[in-house]
């Protein structure tokens, strides 16, 4: 009762929602584990990705709340302004990449095509018929999942460069530092992904690749937060 009257009602609602999401995350976690208890010893990559996505979503909500609390502000992540579309699109792509990263992990898709920049001798995996859209949309196929995961990384990089060119063009000097921090992390993440692949998924490198995604989301949100005036 004390906190109900002392804490801003909107903040209280937010914390209750986080509590509900954490409880739901527990349910999703059990749902994931249950997929490996019957007829298989590994878990469904779809359920794994759902569990991971929920974790990152909760983490992102808390980080955004922390930024507002620290700066005594009330910035809205869903602010509907065209100038922020490219940054929001970048964050969307990063979350999509995390999902496909879970697919790669769940399917052990990193154990095939362990070459870069080509997938063996070709840009496209040679065991997929890209003329048949059903094969390309088969997210149970290791080759398809790895191909999409690779190319999402390229897309994220080019979108980020586009954002950087706009920052330079419009001389948004207050974004130079957060942009460079994020740029360094993106380069590190890409390098770790490549090294994990060509090292036959060395456990340390693969783990660092996964862990660094947490910092990537943190600094992406920091970059977006500072871009909102």
Regions found by a protein language model. Name each.
Residues 1-229:
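Polytopic transmembrane helical bundles with strong interfacial aromatic enrichment
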């Amino acid at each position: 009762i004390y906190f109900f009257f002392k804490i801003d009602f909107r903040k209280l609602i937010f914390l209750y929602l986080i509590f509900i999401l954490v409880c739901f995350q527990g349910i999703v976690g059990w749902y994931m584990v249950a997929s490996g208890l019957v007829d298989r010893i590994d878990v469904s990559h779809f359920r794994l990705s759902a569990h991971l996505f929920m974790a990152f979503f909760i983490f992102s909500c808390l980080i955004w709340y922390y930024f507002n609390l620290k700066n005594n502000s009330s910035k809205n992540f869903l602010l509907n302004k065209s100038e922020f579309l490219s940054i929001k699109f970048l964050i969307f792509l990063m979350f999509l990449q995390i999902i496909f990263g879970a697919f790669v992990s769940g399917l052990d898709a990193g154990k095939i095509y362990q070459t870069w920049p080509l997938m063996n001798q070709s840009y496209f995996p040679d065991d997929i018929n890209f003329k048949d859209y059903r094969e390309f949309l088969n997210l149970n196929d290791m080759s398809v999942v790895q191909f999409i995961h690779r190319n999402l990384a390229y897309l994220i990089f080019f979108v980020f460069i586009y954002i950087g060119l706009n920052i330079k063009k419009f001389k948004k000097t207050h974004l130079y530092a957060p942009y460079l921090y994020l740029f360094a992390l993106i380069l590190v993440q890409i390098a770790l992904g490549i090294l994990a692949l060509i090292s036959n998924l060395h456990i340390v490198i693969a783990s660092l690749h996964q862990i660094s995604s947490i910092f990537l989301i943190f600094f992406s949100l920091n970059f977006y937060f500072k871009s909102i005036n």
